[in-house]
Amino acid sequence: MPRPGSAQRWAAVAGRWGCRLLALLLLVPGPGGASEITFELPDNAKQCFYEDIAQGTKCTLEFQVITGGHYDVDCRLEDPDGKVLYKEMKKQYDSFTFTASKNGTYKFCFSNEFSTFTHKTVYFDFQVGEDPPLFPSENRVSALTQMESACVSIHEALKSVIDYQTHFRLREAQGRSRAEDLNTRVAYWSVGEALILLVVSIGQVFLLKSFFSDKRTTTTRVGS
């Protein structure tokens, strides 16, 4: 016969390990209502994306230019009837939240048509609707168990960690791009200075040589 209290201890251990296992499963990405894409936008180009959204759905569009030029891009969002919901010119990053007023296909475009020479790398995150509940009982009046409440808290914390990591990666990529661009400019400037110094040195050598060169004088006899 098991000793008194052993069942409670085993239940507590099982609960802790079950919560840990569920936390590990939450780390695996699953289906959701968000689309994250990083794409190349050439110069004089425009790229559009389309999303079917139901009426009353809350959506958020967030974008950031990672590399290229002045790190800016034009963004435009339209509803199914072509009405402009959001429009910004030459923005480095921004976020816009709206609620779909009707069913249909919504379009959002990124434009680099104002740039003639530089292409851009653009990241955007388009979130449609709310995440589904972790447990079916979340939508009911009944209270969650202690394990379910802990797992929900872990799930929310993990989502915050993922958001922070995404923003940190974007900042790191943008900072690396700026550093590489600055390094290239410094290298070109150093090569230019070296060439100028070489030309000046050669000019000085020829100038000094002309000062010490022998000048032959010619004499003319005048006959009487």
Curated annotation (Swiss-Prot):
Note whether 4Fe-4S occurs among the keywords. Answer: no
Q: Where is the protein localized? A: Endoplasmic reticulum membrane; Golgi apparatus, cis-Golgi network membrane; Endoplasmic reticulum-Golgi intermediate compartment membrane; Cytoplasmic vesicle, COPI-coated vesicle membrane
Parts of the chain that traverse the membrane? 188-208
| SMART domains in the record | EMP24_GP25L
Tell me the name of the encoding gene.
Answer: TMED7
Organism of provenance = Homo sapiens (Human)
Q: Which residues are glycosylated?
A: N103
According to its UniProt record, which protein family does this protein belong to? Belongs to the EMP24/GP25L family.
PROSITE patterns reported for this sequence: GOLD
User: What InterPro entries does UniProt report for this protein, alphabetically?
Assistant: Emp24-like, GOLD_dom, GOLD_dom_sf
Q: Which SUPFAM superfamilies does the record cross-reference, listed alphabetically?
A: Supernatant protein factor (SPF), C-terminal domain
Taken from the record's topology, the Lumenal segments are: 35-187
**Cytoplasmic topological domain:** 209-224
Give the UniProt record's GO annotations in the biological process aspect: endoplasmic reticulum to Golgi vesicle-mediated transport; Golgi organization; intracellular protein transport
Q: Where does the record place the GOLD domain?
A: 46-128
Give the protein's recorded name: Transmembrane emp24 domain-containing protein 7
Gene Ontology cellular component? Answer: COPI vesicle coat; COPII vesicle coat; COPII-coated ER to Golgi transport vesicle; endoplasmic reticulum; endoplasmic reticulum membrane; endoplasmic reticulum-Golgi intermediate compartment; endoplasmic reticulum-Golgi intermediate compartment membrane; Golgi apparatus
Position of sequence motif COPII vesicle coat-binding: 211-212
Pfam families given for it?
EMP24_GP25L (PF01105)
Q: What does this protein do?
A: Potential role in vesicular protein trafficking, mainly in the early secretory pathway. Appears to play a role in the biosynthesis of secreted cargo including processing and post-translational modifications.
Q: List the disulfide bonds.
A: none
The short motif COPI vesicle coat-binding is annotated over 211-224
